């Protein structure tokens, strides 16, 4: 068990369109409870004096400003879907403020998607104002990665049929957009203080995401001290009502939630 202190900030906890979606008239979308408003999912980890971002969606700028954050040591990407990478252009102020390229770690397929989505960042000549990335392929998902003295364990999982990654950082693990966790990955998820699991809604079942009952079942199997659910749609229901139904060690995450342990 790690002995360093953690601070976890949930920058966003919503599904790909956020909550509410444009034009929504359902009761959850019209709720006055700020915990029912969800930007796209991302988490900011402060651990061993490092600042780590997992995923960088379209709300990244808004999220960083809301939390008064202005530095990232490196970014981990789970997969290439738009709601998880399209905010990468907005790392430019961090490039300027801290005079550094932004290290990004992901599967080779995801690194290629970053190049495809942001081709202007990789032109061969210097142009003022471009984002600057330092791209790192995670070639072997069976090997841990050591980044600035922080051990990162890639966690192969499935988003439907798409192979993606979760990540373990010490006693914390993040499994968004998950539909299936291989047994070999579950073996890497023992002894956790906190695990974050994607849980799209209560029902119906979904082909590429866990619903709440399935996420609870996975949480019980992993037996972390505390479990938080993320990547939540309006179909989950009201935060307050759902939270009251959950076991004592399980929680709906919400935007701006901070954990210290």
Question: What role is predicted for each listed range?
Answer:
Residues 1-175, 184, 241-261:
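Binuclear metal-dependent hydrolase catalytic cores
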Residues 180-261:
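Cap/insert and terminal regions of metallo-dependent hydrolase folds
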């Amino acid at each position: 068990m790690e002995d360093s202190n953690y601070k976890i900030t949930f920058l966003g906890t919503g599904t790909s369109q956020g909550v509410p979606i444009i034009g929504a008239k359902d009761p959850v979308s019209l709720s006055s409870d700020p915990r029912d408003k969800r930007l796209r999912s991302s988490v900011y980890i402060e651990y061993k004096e490092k600042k780590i971002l997992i995923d960088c969606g379209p709300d990244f700028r808004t999220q960083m400003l809301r939390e008064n954050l202005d530095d990232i040591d490196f970014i981990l990407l789970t997969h290439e879907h738009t709601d998880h990478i399209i905010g990468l252009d907005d790392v430019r102020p961090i490039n300027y403020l801290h005079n550094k390229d932004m290290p990004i770690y992901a599967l080779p397929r995801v690194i290629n998607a970053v190049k495809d989505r942001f081709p202007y960042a990789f032109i061969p000549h210097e142009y003022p104002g471009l984002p600057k990335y330092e791209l790192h392929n995670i070639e072997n998902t069976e090997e841990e990665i050591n980044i600035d003295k922080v051990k990162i364990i890639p966690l192969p999982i499935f988003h439907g049929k798409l192979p993606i990654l979760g990540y373990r950082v010490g006693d914390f693990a993040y499994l968004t957009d998950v539909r299936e966790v291989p047994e070999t990955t579950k073996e890497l998820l023992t002894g956790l203080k906190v695990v974050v699991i994607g849980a799209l809604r209560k029902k119906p079942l979904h082909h590429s995401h866990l619903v709440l009952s399935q996420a609870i079942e996975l949480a019980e199997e992993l037996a972390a001290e505390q479990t938080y659910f993320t990547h939540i749609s309006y179909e989950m229901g009201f935060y307050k009502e759902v939270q009251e139904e959950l076991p004592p060690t399980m929680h709906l995450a919400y935007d701006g939630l901070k954990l210290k342990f």
